[in-house]
Structures are given as structure tokens and as C-alpha cells.
């Protein structure tokens, strides 16, 4: 998206990843999203969003793709807390993977630090017939 979308993307990210904090803690700084878009492997066509009926961003999936290695990494996948448990995370990630397949992608790397995200990745990547799963046991 363009600069007009930055506040909405930042707010959706806050609602997805800081659901246990009061909204008054949100500082409104969306410079991180502009920085994300300046990354060499960022592609707008792999920055997928799902909109709520009111037009707000309900879910998002940002993927970086390297044409040379035909590899990708999921950078951000999130669903605003008020839209959890509606299948939106799975929908945006599945759409991102569909786009990667059309580009000729052969490998996708995803990592999660919390069980809900890990379960989402496992369910989707299993459906995509991924054969290599790496698990680091701590």
C-alpha cells in the first residue's frame, strides 16, 4: 500500500499482536511499516490483506520472495483480535501461498513464537504438501 495505508496497517498489527494491552498504549507510530516496505525483497503483490465490512484491515500476510532462489519467507501474518477465529489468517496466508506458487516458488520459510500462529502455519503448510519441517527443541 501507499503511505495512506500505513496507519491502518499499523493499527491492525497492534490489534493482532498486542491484544492483551489497552489500546491507549498504542503510540500511533507507523514508520516500521514504511521501513518494511523498503526492504529489498518486499513486493506489494505479496502483501495480502482482508478487509472487514467497515473497511478496516481485519487480517494481513506479508511475504518476501526471492526470484533467484525461488524461496519465500512469511514476514508478518496477523489477524486483528476482534476478527479472531473466523479463518481470516488462514485465508490471507493461503492467498499469499497461491500467489507464490504462480511465481514458481519452491520453498517457503515460516516461523512462529506462539502456539496459535504455529498451529496456523502447520495446518496451512501441511495442506500445501510441504515435506520439510524444522523444529528447534529448546
Indicate residue ranges for each PLM-predicted region.
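Conserved active-site tyrosine of GNAT-family acetyltransferases
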Residues: 120-126
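Conserved GNAT acetyl-CoA-binding A-motif
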Residues: 100-113
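Conserved catalytic-core motifs of GNAT/GCN5-like acyltransferases
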Residues: 109-111, 126-138
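Short glycine/proline-centered loop/turn elements that form peptide/ligand docking sites
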Residues: 93, 114-117
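A conserved beta-strand-loop-helix scaffold within acyl/acetyltransferase catalytic domains
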Residues: 20-79
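A short beta-loop-alpha structural element at the N-terminal edge
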Residues: 1-11, 22
Amino acid at each position: 500500500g501507499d503511505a495512506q495505508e500505513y496507519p491502518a496497517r499499523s493499527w491492525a498489527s497492534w490489534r493482532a499482536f498486542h491484544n492483551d494491552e489497552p489500546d491507549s498504549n498504542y503510540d500511533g507510530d507507523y514508520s516500521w511499516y514504511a521501513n518494511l516496505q523498503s526492504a529489498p525483497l518486499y513486493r506489494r503483490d505479496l502483501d495480502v490483506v482482508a478487509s472487514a465490512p467497515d473497511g478496516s484491515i481485519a487480517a494481513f500476510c506479508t511475504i518476501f520472495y526471492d526470484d533467484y532462489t525461488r524461496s519465500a519467507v512469511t514476514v508478518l501474518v496477523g489477524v486483528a483480535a476482534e476478527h479472531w477465529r473466523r479463518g481470516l489468517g488462514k485465508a490471507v496466508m493461503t492467498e499469499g501461498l497461491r500467489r507464490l506458487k504462480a511465481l514458481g516458488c519452491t520453498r517457503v520459510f515460516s516461523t512462529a513464537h506462539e502456539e496459535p500462529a504455529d498451529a496456523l502455519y502447520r495446518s496451512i503448510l501441511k495442506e500445501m504438501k510441504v515435506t520439510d519441517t524444522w523444529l528447534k527443541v529448546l
